[in-house]
Amino acid sequence: MNKPVWPGCVSCDEKYLDYLVSNNIYLLPWSSQARGFFVQQDLFPKFIHGANPTLEEEIRVWHSKDNLDRRKRCFELAEKLNCTPIELALAYVINRNENIFPLVGPRNLFESESCMQALRINLTQEEIHFLMEG
C-alpha cells in the first residue's frame, strides 16, 4: 500500500510482522486482496460493482513500481499454479504465517468462490519470496 485507502489505515511491514509473530500476536489484515488489484478487470466485467475502487483510488493506493512488479509476478505464478491471481494473492497472505487470519468481504459468488479456492493453494517459501521480492 502506497497511501492509506482511508485515514488511519496502516500497512504491516516485515519488521512489524516479525514483532507480531515473535510475540504470538495475531494479525487480521483488512484488505487481504487489495480491493481487486489482482483481478484482471477486463476478464470479469460482470463482477464489477460499486464497492470496487475507482481507477484513481487504485493508482493512488497500490500503483508503484514495486507493487506493479509484484502484480506481474502474481499473474505469472498463478498461471503456473493453475489458479487465478486473486486466489493466489489471498493464498499468499494465508501462507505467510499461521498467526495471520486475513479478513475478506466477498460481495458476490465469484468473490466467495475465489476466497475458497485460495485455501487450496499451498505455497513454498520460494514462491512466497518470489511474489514479494522476485
Label each residue range with its predicted role.
Residues 1-133:
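Beta/alpha (TIM)-barrel catalytic core signal, keyed to glycine-rich beta->alpha loops juxtaposed to Asp/Glu
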